[in-house]
From Swiss-Prot:
PROSITE patterns reported in the protein's UniProt record: DENN, ZF_DAG_PE_2
Composition bias type Basic and acidic residues, residue spans: 178-187, 784-798
Residue ranges, compositional bias (Acidic residues): 39-49
Protein name (record): Elicitor of plant defense protein 1
Polar residues composition bias: residue spans: 64-99, 695-711, 744-760
Phylogenetic lineage: Eukaryota, Fungi, Dikarya, Ascomycota, Pezizomycotina
Domain uDENN per the UniProt entry, residue ranges: 242-500
GO molecular function: metal ion binding
Length: 1151
């Protein structure tokens, strides 16, 4: 077991709003204070504008001419987003922009007049704001219909986001921007025989950009060391990030639209732990701003807003990165604060709303309460009427009508909520109906631990939800008892250590849960076990994925846009991970705060994510790529530099086999549920199932980079398919050998169907099922929402492909069992429309050949010739088959003994549904809560292999041109010198232009620089070289394994040519290179961190369910180990003396 002195996490922190207070609009602004010298970047000259700058015209940055923008973004006028602390490593202020002090107060008189909802005019004509609406003959139902049809413009003068519903806004239009079409066109230089037709290829505008972007050097090999340092200096945050813009404090703004600056409430280790601070690194100032990228708003909501999560990345001045994960929960404002907010709202109502508008809001509240009462009465009648009877159907229709009316009235009331009381009896949860967010987060230096941190944070905030997360067994001495938050924090940040390699996995416990932190082995792609790529592939089509990859290879300015911050985090990290072996070396900001939007004008490559709800989003004038993750679109100012034709077609072909979730399994496009909120459908489900399992999935990289294209669709053996985890606590019982599960209440609660965020999230609709509405009490609360959303009585058509025949074993022709050593399959042209039944018919298992059927010998069939002629067949829901998130559920009417994987309840006598791929079982009522992809519908390991195979084909001969360095190069520490010109000339004719483009990119220069400076046997260098060797081996013919005496002898001595996977089903004779197939270091021996336990003062439930703004040091215990090194307790006079540990508790700040 390795020893480590690196903690598993550097810091735990809490951020939120310090106090809800509204300054007097008549008060004078604070006098201007010059910017202190501490925020001036080290080594940079004095900034001139700090002594005489012009104030901004509004809260957000306004459009300026190019000269002023470039002047503002110049190198000598940058602020660093890295820590701006004092010499002791800590700032005295806990605010997110503590070191930014405006010289002149901003002038808000001209900005945001229309968006603040401060119009003195009544509602627009045609809306419900007219005075005639309050007459006695007013038809309320017609008003509801009108609102449903015109809700986007309804009362737009009064609508406010307040962290809630995202209103439709004018599209961000740039006259130079165009929609990138998924069309394959010739790229690169054409051969002389094909140059007659030719093509006009648009060049990337950034090459001709008049900016300070890096300039290519013709003598890369002789000046690379210096140029790399220069480029890194240009590409760090100091070069592109301006100071945060001040908050908009317009006195006419509605109190619930007012944004508050997030502050750091507490952290561990605390500021007083000097030795620990120096060892872990200084704590950045801007963490609260990245935790709340759109700042903080008080939300008025009947229900507690949904918990969300996201990650962010911060870069310091030395180009080292800090990674953060935060989970946000919502705290109800206490009565005193809520009363103060209500007073401010009343003052605003008196000065900004007409009497008719206030009367409308009050009337809506009364009508809504009445409809809720009516719904309760109808639900009480539901169990008394037999299922299937006409009366039952009429009652269900009436219930659906009332629910629809309630939904519309709630949406109508939302913009007018400030015209009625904040709390509506019988509707509002909590004591006030006003909520403020609070963030709990982790900072660390290892990006591979981000998924682990996320699941750990979800576990520790579960008791804070006080029952909102369903199907959590009650705590007990046998099952486990919750501990105070402070003890979990010490356990993670002090007692746990970070695993160094694949020999050790670190086990952490939260009650009965066991989480395992792991690292990839040296012969695995970095991040392949820890970085999720499925979310990106669910949002974008394969054509857009490849186009995005091409933009990243060309180092474009890439801007991701989404309504969900967590989706931005997942997409940015997935894209960077797919570039392996190249590394994104430029600006990387997965979540760009709204007050730093002017960084989009940075004249250098970047990958940046912005939320759709930001106000006044202004894109650069040219040279950028806008990727809308919610709408599956890519808009750019120019076409991408396309991959070479053959490489692009083969990549697309492999991706269609590795990621068939949309083509063959009917998965909807859009962010997955786990990218929308922390607990989808109020369940502790996890997309990172391996984190909760002791056993580690086998490495498959060697298999898929050695496999021929024709065998790339081979199905996984059933014993290697890990089913998704829909309840981590239930899986913990299975891991511990416990099968009993205490029953729970509230089992019918589901995520609200309203699309208002973050109060609720609108998930993909539940599929139609033949299940009766009288299944159980679970259905009472859920099926009604399903019917209202159109989930019943409507067949959902999804697209699929005739690829589904891989559910059947391949048919063999009699008398011809082998063709040249390969199995013979039916031709694609022989697949009829009825063949779709084979997709859903394999209920009994079998994992036949997974590639496209063909009569050709598989070794002679190129992947690029298969997919263009592929026939697409629709995926249909039938009476016995339901498709949900890639799962093909078949109805098993006689199965009354299986346990539902989703709700962990036994079958109730009416049968269950079983997935033909991963074998999970579900009640009919639970199908809509299946939020995780089926492992058979998406193969992340093959997707990564497809991209790395593409890059291996582009860089196939690079090692041949690493020669001896010159004396000057040797003095710079180079071991090799790369002949760039020789490498480009050696490539095929159609790859010359693409290689010339790569020559100008920083990521390729870094790739060559690393190989010039490091020996070839270094593990990080050798891995990609071995992948290239596997590509070479794929092109060599060999005997079948079964006919080779040598292979038999090797297998008998544990040296199987297939690395333990057995011969490929597609007939491939590829041999896995020894390095890629070596599993001697794939041990992952468990090193357990002491479990937090013990008694603590105070009432148990009060302590474990609190949502503290500051950590209580009295509830902490001295760490039992320091990053894995145990502290021995003294035992009498002969006992060993306890190792001295610096006090990291500090004192509890005054509340």
């Amino acid at each position: 077991m390795e020893s480590s002195s690196t903690p598993l996490a550097e810091y735990f922190w809490i951020a939120g709003v310090e106090s809800v207070s509204y300054q007097d609009p008549n008060s004078q602004p604070a006098p201007a204070v010059p910017v202190e010298s501490t925020i001036i970047e080290d080594g940079e000259p004095e900034d001139e504008w700090t002594n005489g700058g012009q104030p901004k015209t509004n809260a957000r940055h306004s459009r300026q001419n190019s000269a002023s923008r470039l002047s503002k973004m110049s190198l000598t006028e940058r602020f660093s987003i890295q820590t701006l602390d004092d010499t002791d490593g800590n700032t005295k202020s806990n605010r997110s922009s503590a070191t930014i002090r405006a010289v002149n107060p901003p002038d808000f008189s001209n900005g945001n007049d229309d968006s603040n909802g401060n119009s003195q005019n009544p509602a627009p004509s045609g809306t419900l704001g007219e005075g005639s609406m309050f007459m006695g003959d007013f038809d309320f139902d017609k008003a509801l219909v009108k609102f449903a049809a015109e809700r986007e413009v309804f009362l737009e003068d009064l609508t406010f986001s307040a962290g809630a519903k995202v209103q439709a806004r004018a599209p961000m239009v740039n006259p130079r921007m165009e929609r990138i079409r998924a069309e394959e066109s010739d790229s690169g230089r054409l051969s002389p025989l094909r140059s007659i037709k030719g093509s006009i290829r648009r060049k990337m505008s950034f090459r001709d950009m008049n900016s300070v972007r890096k300039q290519p050097s013709n003598r890369i090999s002789t000046s690379r060391a210096a140029s790399i340092r220069t480029t890194r200096r240009l590409s760090n945050y100091n070069s592109v990030i301006p100071p945060p813009e001040p908050l908009n404090t317009d006195p006419d703004m509605h109190p619930l639209k007012r944004r508050f600056e997030p502050v750091l409430l507490d952290r561990y280790p605390p500021q007083e732990a000097g030795d620990e601070i120096s060892r872990r690194g200084r704590f950045p100032d801007y963490v609260p701003m990245f935790a709340f990228p759109n700042d903080i708003q008080i939300v008025s909501s009947d229900d507690r807003p949904r918990s969300t999560w996201h990650g962010f990345t911060m870069t310091s001045d030395d180009n080292s990165k800090l990674y953060g994960i935060t989970i946000i929960i919502w705290i109800a404002l206490n009565a005193d604060v809520a009363e103060d907010v209500e007073k401010k709202c009343e003052e605003w109502r008196q000065s900004h709303m007409s009497e008719e508008e206030r009367e409308l809001a009050a009337s809506l509240g009364v009508r809504l309460a009445g409809e809720r009462t009516h719904l309760s009465q109808l639900l009480a009648k539901l169990p008394t009427i037999p299922s299937g009877s006409p009366a039952r159907e009429r009652l269900e229709d009436e219930i659906s009508t009332v629910e629809e009316k309630i939904t519309l009235m709630t949406d109508m009331l939302r913009p007018l909520r400030h015209g009625a009381a904040s709390k509506i009896e019988g509707l509002t949860a909590g004591e006030s109906g006003l909520w403020a967010p609070r963030a709990y987060g982790i900072l660390g230096r290892d990006a591979g631990n981000m998924s682990f941190w996320k699941e750990w944070l979800k576990a520790i905030v579960t008791p804070m939800t006080d029952g909102s997360v369903l199907r959590i067994p009650p705590s007990s001495p046998r099952v486990g008892r919750w501990q105070p938050l402070e003890r979990y924090v010490v356990n993670l940040c002090t007692e746990a250590f970070n695993p160094l390699g694949s020999k050790t996995q670190v086990e952490l416990g939260v009650r009965e849960l066991r989480l395992y932190a792991r690292k990839e082995a040296d012969n695995e792609i970095p991040g392949s076990r820890t970085i999720d790529i499925y979310a990106l592939f669910r949002c974008l089509s394969l054509e857009n994925i490849v186009a995005l990859f091409e933009y990243a290879m060309a180092e474009s300015r890439i801007i991701f846009l989404s309504s969900h911050a967590s989706m931005l985090h997942l997409a940015c990290h997935a894209l960077a991970n797919l570039l392996y072996p190249l590394k994104w070396a430029s600006i990387f900001i997965p979540i760009l705060p709204a007050r730093l939007l002017s960084a989009l004008e940075a004249p250098c490559p970047y990958i940046v994510g912005i939320e759709r709800r930001y106000d006044n989003i202004e894109l650069p004038e040219d040279d950028y790529v806008l990727v809308d993750l919610d709408k599956d679109t890519i808009d750019a100012t120019s076409q991408p530099v396309r991959l070479p034709r053959q490489a692009r077609r083969k990549l697309m072909s492999l991706l269609q086999v590795a990621a068939p979730h949309k083509l063959r399994y009917g998965v909807a496009t859009g962010p997955p549920p786990y990218a929308m909120e922390s607990f989808p459908y109020d369940a502790f489900s996890t997309e990172n199932g391996s984190l909760f399992r002791t056993s580690t999935p086998k490495s498959t990289l060697g298999k898929w980079v050695s496999q021929s294209s024709s065998g790339f669709g081979e199905a996984d053996p059933p014993n290697e398919i890990q089913p998704p985890i829909f309840n981590a606590f239930a899986s913990a019982h299975v891991e511990n050998g416990k099968s009993d599960r205490p029953s729970t209440s509230k089992s019918g609660k589901t995520s609200p169907q309203s699309s208002v965020s973050p109060v609720s999230i609108n998930f993909p609709p539940m599929p139609s099922t033949p299940v009766s509405r009288s299944d159980s009490g679970f259905a009472l609360a859920s099926t009604l929402r399903e019917k209202r959303s159109g989930h019943f009585g409507e067949e959902k058509m999804r697209r699929s492909s005739s690829f589904g025949v891989d559910k059947h074993p391949p048919f063999q022709k009699p008398g011809m069992p082998f063709l040249n050593g390969h199995q013979a399959n039916l031709s694609i042209s022989a697949i009829s429309v009825e063949s779709q039944n084979s997709v859903i018919g394999g209920a009994n298992g079998g994992y036949g050949g997974g590639y496209a059927p063909s009569t050709y010998a598989q070794s002679t069939l190129a992947a690029s010739t298969i997919m263009p002629s592929m026939q697409i067949q629709p995926v249909r829901n039938t009476e016995t088959t339901v498709w949900v998130e890639g799962h093909c559920f078949n109805y098993m009417p006689k199965d009354n003994t299986s346990m539902c994987t989703i709700c962990n309840d036994l079958a109730e006598g009416d049968g269950v549904y079983r997935c033909t791929g991963c074998k999970i079982v579900s009640h009919g009522r639970c199908l809509g809560y299946c939020s995780l992809i089926c492992p058979e519908a998406f193969h992340a390991d093959r997707v990564r292999a497809a991209f790395v195979r593409c890059l291996a084909s582009l860089l196939y001969t690079y090692r041949k041109y690493l020669g001896r360095p010159s004396k000057q190069q040797k003095s710079n520490g180079q071991l090799y010198a790369f002949d760039m010109d020789g490498f480009i000339k050696s490539l095929p004719h159609d790859q010359h232009d693409y290689a010339a483009m790569m020559r100008e990119t920083q990521c390729f220069n870094e790739f060559i620089h690393d190989r010039e400076m490091q020996p070839a046997n270094d593990a990080s260098i050798r891995l990609f070289d071995e992948i290239i060797m596997a590509k070479k081996a794929r092109g060599r013919s060999g005997l079948a394994t079964g006919l080779s005496r040598l292979s038999t002898l090797r297998a008998s001595h544990g040296a199987s040519t297939y690395g333990g996977f057995g011969p490929a089903r597609g007939g491939s004779n590829s041999k896995i290179p020894a390095f890629l197939g070596d599993i001697s270091d794939h041990i992952w021996r468990t090193a357990s961190v002491p479990l937090p336990k013990g008694n603590f003062p105070g009432e148990y439930k009060t302590i474990v369910t609190r949502t503290p703004a500051r950590l209580d040091r009295s509830l902490m215990r001295e760490p039992r180990s320091i990053q894995g090194m145990p502290r021995v307790e003294p035992r009498g006079t002969r006992g060993l003396i306890r190792k001295q540990v610096p006090n990291m508790f500090g004192t509890t700040p005054p509340t």
